[in-house]
Amino acid sequence: MTSPSLRVLPCLAIAFAYTIPRAAHAADPVASISFVEMAEQAPAARDADPTAAGISAVGVKAAAAAAARPTDILVLFDTSASQMGDFRRSGIDALSALLDAARPGDRYALAAIDVECVPLGKDFGPARGPEMTRALQSLAARTPLGSTDLVRGLLKAAELFAPGDRPRVVVYIGDGPGVDGVEPAEFAAALDTLRARRIAVTSLGIGPQINWPLLAALGHATGGMLVIPGENHEAKAAGTRTGSLAVQAVIWPEDSALGAAGKAALRMLPSRLPPLRSDRESILLIEGPVKDAMLSFAVDADGARKPVQLTLPAPVVSPDNAFLGELARNARETDGIFLPILGREGLSLTRAAMVGEAATLALLSRQAEAAGSHASAVRLAEASLRRDPDNRVAGIVRTVAQKRAVDAPPPPAPAFDVPQGNGELAELEAMRRVRGQQLERETAVRIRDARQLLTTDPERARSELKEAQDRVRLDPDLDATARTTLLAQLEARI
């Protein structure tokens, strides 16, 4: 998918390759079902994972935009080590534009986040008031250090809001957690806290390696959004857009339940209906037959609790949605809290990412088959086909490897018991090695290009090398030895 210059997940009007019915299928004065789509599995994918059939994506939207009320906005500005140089300047530009576009009735506060969340002011106030001026001065004095503990920061941020009925919003500016990621139990607890206190989190992705899947999952679970500036450094435009999106009205459904027609069994991922907005879908993955199923929940409307019931229509079947089976398969263990399906574009980006994984796995399967490891080749090819049934390389390799595995003589018994590893973990480790090797090659090319550039534009050469250095330092796929070697080479050139 080609990246737009300013990506908003999912507000840009983008025409996707799959068919999306434009009319709402089931409506209520509060919410409506905007689309229901199902994965049409190719035989190759069905053979690779027979349990993945019957996965539907369902889009739910608030029926109409409610009037946005005066809001309290806490800006979490990432001051970790990744936010240096141009990234720091872009973040400051975006923050300045966000504050300049603030509405008169909104109140703002600023906090820094790295290994912990540190408030930079005493209270919420006008976007360009004296309290914010002092907070911005404190921010300018902070040196980017450490990593980003986003979960801990969000829990601290939730405590900074005063009691009352004003809408609460967190705007995070940064690239998200680094190589360590977040623990599922801790992330789930943070989401529970944010939801209980009705705090929507909108993120502005700025940094060398934006963890967009996690930031998208955070926005999906809390009724927020995600904006990622393009390569043209449009930080100010992104800041203005982020500020506008962050204060849009959010509906907080409670007691959500999914009832199947007849005796069919259904499972919803995530298991709780996310908050609803009128400017994007809240997307659910549903396992099982969805036609005539009933999605019910309650909302606060006009000072009273209002029940809502939406009947799901028959899904539109599309082969482009075959990735939904593997997406749901990967999400079951964590109850769907990490699903990055932030509206339709989030769904499309997720598909593109999984197709990329399928290509990597297909390459690994071909390498395994060339080395005579037929069983590994079959396993890797099937993992590729679960993500992208149209991957021809994986389909051919699987067919060839299965035939050769049958024809090959049985291997000799090992002299000692060999423990069997987890198949999925082996796949991920193999993918990690390939991506690490690719980064090593890319770094070597960048060093060579910088050497050629040195005689004509030494400042640009140094900047290119420092960008490569940041990427090597933060990339999760490099092993420690390769990382140390590459960093030493880059440091010597710099």
Task: Name every feature range the model reports, one short phrase each.
Residues 8-22:
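Bacterial N-terminal signal peptides
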Residues 28-36, 107-138, 155-161, 180-185, ...:
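Short beta-strand-loop
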Residues 29-46, 54-57, 64-74, 98, ...:
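An acidic, Ser/Thr-enriched
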Residues 55-57, 88, 92-99, 129-136, ...:
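Extracytoplasmic/secreted envelope proteins and their assembly/folding machinery
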Residues 66-126, 150-158, 166-174, 202-206, ...:
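Von Willebrand factor
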Residues 76-87, 121-125, 138-146, 176-178, ...:
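Second-shell loop/turn segments in exported
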Residues 176-229, 237-240:
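VWA/integrin I-like adhesion module and closely mimicked acidic/polar interface patches used
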Residues 351, 355-494:
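Alpha-helical, heptad-rich or low-complexity scaffold/stalk segments
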